[in-house]
Amino acid sequence: MTSSTAKSGVGGRPIETYERKTAEVHSWDPATVDVAQRISDLIKERRPDLVVEHIGSTAVPGLPGKGIVDLSIETEPAEIPGIVEMLYELGFQPQPGPDPWPPTRPMPVGSIEHDGTEYRIHLHVQPKGGDFPRDIAFREALRNDPELTRQYTDLKLGITQGGAVDGFRYTHSKTTWILGVYRKLGFVPPAILPPATIGILGGGQLGRMLALAAREMGYRIAVLDPDEHCPAASVADRVVVGTYDDLEAARRLADGCAVVTYELEHVSAPLVSAIDDGVVAMRPGPYPLKMTQDRLAERKFLESNGVPVAPWRPVSSAAELRAAAAQLGYPVRLKANIGGYDGRSQRRLANPEEVKAHIAAQPIDTRMLLEREMQFRSELSVVVARATDGICVSFPPARNRHDDGILVESVVPAGIAPEVEEAARELAERLATGMGLIGVLTVELFLMRDGSLVVNELAPRVHNSGHWTIEGAATSQFEQHVRAICGLPLGSVELRSPAAAMVNLLGGGDRRPTTIEGLREALAVQDTHLHLYDKRDVFERRKMGHVTALGATTDEALARAREAASHLRWGGPSGDADADG
């Protein structure tokens, strides 16, 4: 709520425009009860049959909160479009931001002036059979249980610490506590149990290993991929051939699925939003995907959550590139804002002459990200899972080595101080909570020479640097992702042996049909495990598989994995090439 001079709504309508703001906790304002009644009266003038309930924190006397007036209407699903249209006529607007409620359960927003103060309004339009009874029960529990109200107050004040925080972080940081109250009230969301079908957007090696883990748990699998012979095809029950922006193909995939997930970030965000319709569970949802597809949005998200990143600037012209490089200091890395993985779509620029040469060869005509190259001690990654109840479980950090942007090796333990490991895992769990993710998130980090951590990038999915978990941890990242998206308890992340290592198997040479040599020698190496991705063709630096090894130390595990990988060669007319590139 903010003080306001008198004004009228857009076009003379009673409801005024809405502005998203950071979250601040204020004392309860009794005027919010009058505001709620005013909104209810406005709606009943148009639709006397509707019951408008005041919910949320402002509906509980004495409970601090953001001051937003939350209201809820329960109706038949077929009535929702007409009710939303009526609300728009009053001046309400569609919910802004990157993570709106689906059209099957919309939340129009607006504001209204009351006694010289502007109040923001969230109006939830809920289908019968949805969460309306739960929200009312939660309100009544808070109204009638002073201890519950005290706990909720302490939680809110603990999140904001007397200041303003990102709205998503504020909302999702309350999830675990709120869902615990729901359970006590008897509202427990049902888990998705076998033999339900899990849909996977993307049929590459990550989709394949997800499918294998899910099938071991008894689930059926449907996959969407442009290639009918993709790696996941041979382990899926159903393959839908289509591109990652083919909405019709995605709907065919979702038909018959209980939950849909994605194995890569190159899926169309509008496509994911369309699937996330409140009928089929889309996990993770559209917001983590949108945010990580856009590097500038990702940087802003990280900074809004108090996470350190490399100094950066947005650039969209040659002049901006020159100025930003001079401000940041060389060397810098110029990255495409959209797209790119495994080091693609980025360029290292070491001095002004290289900037000049790059501009001459490739004019800057779109938004890009320029960041200072970090002088780090090592590269780390943390894979964290967040369940439907908001509980987060993170795997031990892995220490990674890249070659020209492509991951080559990962080892666990990472050989870092206990306090650094604790900080890395806490940071990953905070980010998963801040984006409201359900599933697995991978956080790539730089460990700086002073022991501090800097986030490089995020991936809202299972990740190459987590492959060691298949044999190295009690629960693999793939099984953990399935558990999370299906509403099951998360598994243990304890190591199965003192150390684990993973070495990627990269292709070499020209494109040709896949044949592999040296399997007998590779499999003879003690305590090693070979994973091949069933890719029909091999070519230079293509990820064809990986080797995991266990050992008493990271040196022993890595030596075993390297030895096994060294025996593997890709045959074919263009000549042999080492499997590890």
Predicted regions: what they are:
Residues 2-53:
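Helical scaffold of the NTase/Pol beta-like nucleotidyltransferase catalytic core
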Residues 40-82:
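Active-site nucleotide-donor binding segment shared across nucleotidyl transfer reactions
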Residues 92-130:
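Conserved catalytic core of two-metal-ion nucleotidyltransferases
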Residues 129-190:
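Catalytic cores of NTP-dependent nucleotidyl/adenyl transfer enzymes across multiple folds
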Residues 190-297, 319:
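ATP-binding N-terminal substructure of ATP-dependent carboxylate-amine bond-forming enzymes
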Residues 194, 483-581:
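Peripheral (often C-terminal) accessory segments that flank ATP-dependent C-N-forming ligase machineries
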Residues 291-381, 385-404, 408-434:
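Active-site nucleotide/adenylate-binding loops and adjacent lid/helix of ATP-dependent enzymes
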Residues 422-443, 449, 459-511:
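Active-site "cap" helix and flanking loop/linker of ATP-utilizing ligase/carboxylase catalytic domains
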